[in-house]
Curated annotation (Swiss-Prot):
Component of a multi-subunit COQ enzyme complex, composed of at least COQ3, COQ4, COQ5, COQ6, COQ7 and COQ9. Pfam families: COQ7. The gene is CAT5. GO terms for cellular component: extrinsic component of mitochondrial inner membrane; mitochondrial inner membrane; mitochondrion. Keywords: Iron, Membrane, Metal-binding, Mitochondrion, Mitochondrion inner membrane, Monooxygenase, Oxidoreductase, Phosphoprotein, Transit peptide, Ubiquinone biosynthesis. This is 5-demethoxyubiquinone hydroxylase, mitochondrial.
Amino acid sequence: MLSRVSVFKPASRGFSVLSSLKITEHTSAKHTEKPEHAPKCQNLSDAQAAFLDRVIRVDQAGELGADYIYAGQYFVLAHRYPHLKPVLKHIWDQEIHHHNTFNNLQLKRRVRPSLLTPLWKAGAFAMGAGTALISPEAAMACTEAVETVIGGHYNGQLRNLANQFNLERTDGTKGPSEEIKSLTSTIQQFRDDELEHLDTAIKHDSYMAVPYTVITEGIKTICRVAIWSAERI
């Protein structure tokens, strides 16, 4: 997830697309030539393009929020509870990487960021630091709640990407474009990371937080409202 300037201002993220070359060797060398041009997909409809913009806008806002939540937790807990420092750092580093990735996707597609970005920064840091000040278990309950909602959010996006982007290609076949494949792969990986964070929170006694239900259900509600708002504003 990369470098950071300070815990108050988490860093932005990077994104790369790799291609691979498979070489097969036989007793007598044979070379398979690649076609000069891969089949092109039809242009996205206005609705499909708008959906992608919403995906990138809300995911960038969400990962920014997660970056700041874990910055707040790390700031409060890392020195008070040294045994939690590597756990928190691992989670935060992954969120920094997620944040950087969607920052770059946002720039690449020229997607307008959420107008509520200053609110996401302040609110997320306050949520992370505030729950950490209550107790380590409350911080883990915060993580459990956030990652439960985000995991479900990413699953919904993956279903829509699978169902709405079966595009016609110039060679007569159908399927997602390389851009959609790449975005799908990114979201799948990030979804898995978030669920790993959820498991980590449970292993570190999130259920021992007091008051557990108030913290988790309150934060889940805040996250759902934030997702709805970031998609639209």
